[in-house]
A protein has these predicted regions:
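Short helix-initiation/N-cap motifs at beta->coil->alpha
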Residues: 40-42, 95-106, 236-245
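Alpha-helical, coiled-coil/dimerization segments enriched in small aliphatic residues
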Residues: 81-87, 213-241
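A short, structured surface patch at a secondary-structure boundary
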Residues: 56-111, 115, 120-123, 232
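Bacterial Sec-exported substrate-binding components of ABC uptake systems
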Residues: 2-4, 17-63, 167-204, 314-320
Length: 320
């Protein structure tokens, strides 16, 4: 199944590029006459022409750009959480990597960027490369993934971001093609999910030693629900929360989803859970039911079908 999702995505990219080559004149006409105005998290973006020197910060934003075939419009990227999505690797290799973490304001200016697309609003501040207002004063438009700012974001929220980026770059048709393909891939995965009398109780383990940092009403909660399971902390009014080990044990998770990113490996997290006096008492640990998911796949980007497949395969191995 995973290979099928990858093949379909790669085929879409090839088709999108071919389609754009055939309609270059139409795109150029649209770019020269249309002014795009988008409201984005308190900032009004007024784009008189498609950006040609874009920078992405945060991997799920980078992968949206690459899935739309916009690598030639990029002058830099920064901050990977995990391995780049396989069908996008070749396109990613064509983009200069400015930093493994956050690029500096000086790096941004040196690239002569005209657009910055960030996955998280937290990167737009004085400690990193400047506020959105400051960058706007430098004639650098910015866009923050709105779906990453919401409590309980939906797949449609992600599609709104994809449509907005496609609109800014004047490639609306390509954006709709990508959304259509993601929907097809989602249907391919969810069609195999069995009906169950009781949803599996799932705990997300991101990190923590004395407490547990876990998903509440984040996009990962949305994904878990889409495959027919229940996030045991999905009733909390936030995206990610810190809870006590005792509370996690009391909710008796049957499966633990491990977010995989950064310097602490998934194997190390699983080892910690097995050795922890409290968390090792959960049914999930005692039955060694762990599902590892790359953080970017669980984020508000283009890897929704891959994320659903990973979760469903771990939850219902007999069906996959």
């Amino acid at each position: 199944m995973k290979k099928r999702v990858w093949i379909l995505t790669a085929a879409l990219l090839l088709a999108a590029c071919t389609s754009d080559e055939q309609s270059t004149k139409d795109v150029e006409t649209e770019q020269s006459t249309d002014v795009v105005t988008i409201e984005n998290e308190g900032i009004t973006i007024v784009s008189e022409q498609a950006p040609t020197r874009a920078i992405t910060v945060n991997q799920h934003a980078t992968e949206v750009m690459l899935a739309l075939g916009l690598e030639d419009s990029m002058v830099g990227t920064a901050y990977l959480d995990d391995a780049i999505y396989e069908p996008l690797q070749e396109a990613y290799n064509q983009v200069p990597v400015l930093s493994e973490t956050s690029p500096s304001k000086e790096q941004i200016i040196e690239t002569e960027a005209d657009f910055i697309y960030g996955g998280w609003a937290s990167f737009f501040n004085e400690k990193k490369f400047g506020s959105r207002e400051e960058l706007q004063a430098l004639e650098i438009d910015t866009y923050v993934q709105s779906s990453s700012m919401k409590i309980a974001p939906t797949v449609e929220d992600v599609y709104t971001d994809i449509r907005n980026i496609a609109k800014i770059f004047r490639i609306e048709q390509r954006g709709e093609q990508l959304i259509s393909q993601i929907n097809e891939d989602i249907d391919t995965v969810t069609a195999k999910i069995p009906n169950t009398e009781k949803p599996l109780d799932v705990l997300v383990f991101d990190s923590g030693e004395t407490e547990v940092y876990t998903a509440a009403q984040s996009f990962l909660n949305t994904l878990i629900t889409m495959v027919g399971a229940k996030n045991v902390f999905g009733d909390m009014e936030d995206t990610w929360v810190i809870v006590s080990k005792e509370d996690a044990v009391e909710r008796s998770p049957e499966v633990i989803v491990i977010t995989d990113y950064g310097s602490t490996t998934a194997e190390e997290k699983i080892r910690f859970l097995k050795n922890d006096p409290a968390l090792s008492q959960t049914p999930a640990v005692q039955n060694e039911r762990f599902v590892v998911i790359p953080l970017t796949a669980a984020s508000e980007g283009v890897r929704i079908a891959e994320a659903l497949e990973i979760l469903a395969t771990g939850f219902y191995p007999e069906a996959f």
